[in-house]
Amino acid sequence: MLLKLGIPKGSLENATIDLFRRAGFQITTSSRSYFPGIDDPEIECMLIRAQEMARYVEDGILDSGLTGRDWIEENEAAIVPVADLIYAKQSFGKVRWVLAVPEASSFRTVHDLEGKIIATELVATTKRYMAKHGVKAKVEFSWGATEVKPPVLADAIVEVTETGSSLRANKLKIIDTVLESNTQLIANKASWEDPEKRRKLEDIRMLLQGAINALGKVGLMLNVHKDNLKAVLGVLPALKRPTISHLSDDEWLAVNTILDESTVRDIIPRLKQAGGEGIVEYPLNKIVL
């Protein structure tokens, strides 16, 4: 069995390869090849632009791939959604395709764009959005650098954003969200019906989701005398349920828990003050629920 897997080339490429690394797969790329190596003999990788991924998966050229929900909807691709994977090129959340106009313009809502020109890479989705709102506008395909087009080359744009910083830098304001998107692991319908390929995809899904669950988390373990256990547990977040086990000395216990990495610098000193000893913080690659 060989699973042909599409890795998104471009802005999501590095984040995707890093996610696979956290999941236990080593993917190696070369600037001269569109076929990255992977340390799994059951997988063959190919670099494909996210915009085209769903089409190649639908047609069976690829068994599976990772792409945005935005491009699946744009291509109206008939694929099997295997998993929602909430990560992006700069962050680990969803991205938005937004309708934006110049800050100095009088446009306030989508209805103000009647008869205007809208530039975007997401043409079909934007046309459906405008039709839903009953607005007739000219939607033009943009090959890139879309933010610089208003007000000379377009009246408005529909563009993807994570933080909005690029839009603000180009003096644009958001007047509506057209679509929220996140990365999805998708499969060809026939491949999903193949028992061996489906098993492999389910394994990949579990490992990738486990890697995402571990992002921003760390493990913390410490020893505590039984007389100080209540004080130590009082320091830990109320919703966390640590694992508590006895040591060889019955007077002492080991406490093991998972915490948000951002909270550890405040919690460790308090654990020490509460009687914790031998405190060890360690990184996590996967949390499989």
UniProtKB/Swiss-Prot annotation:
Subcellular location, record wording: Cytoplasm
Descriptive protein name: ATP phosphoribosyltransferase
Co-factor(s): Mg(2+)
Gene3D superfamilies, per database record: 3.30.70.120, Periplasmic binding protein-like II (3.40.190.10)
Top-level EC class: transferase
SUPFAM superfamilies: GlnB-like, Periplasmic binding protein-like II
Function: Catalyzes the condensation of ATP and 5-phosphoribose 1-diphosphate to form N'-(5'-phosphoribosyl)-ATP (PR-ATP). Has a crucial role in the pathway because the rate of histidine biosynthesis seems to be controlled primarily by regulation of HisG enzymatic activity.
Gene Ontology MF, one: ATP binding
Reactions catalysed according to its record: 1-(5-phospho-beta-D-ribosyl)-ATP + diphosphate = 5-phospho-alpha-D-ribose 1-diphosphate + ATP
Keyword field contains Kinase: no
Primary location class: cytoplasm
HAMAP family registered for this protein in UniProt: HisG_Long (MF_00079)
Regulation of activity: Feedback inhibited by histidine.
GO terms for biological process, alphabetical: L-histidine biosynthetic process
Classification via InterPro entries: ATP-PRT_HisG_long, ATP_PRibTrfase_cat, ATP_PRibTrfase_HisG, HisG_C, N-reg_PII-like_a/b, N-reg_PII/ATP_PRibTrfase_C
EC number in record: 2.4.2.17
GO cellular component: cytoplasm
Family the UniProt entry places it in: Belongs to the ATP phosphoribosyltransferase family. Long subfamily.
UniProt pathway annotation: Amino-acid biosynthesis; L-histidine biosynthesis; L-histidine from 5-phospho-alpha-D-ribose 1-diphosphate: step 1/9
Protein's organism: Solibacter usitatus (strain Ellin6076)
Keywords: Amino-acid biosynthesis, ATP-binding, Cytoplasm, Glycosyltransferase, Histidine biosynthesis, Magnesium, Metal-binding, Nucleotide-binding, Transferase
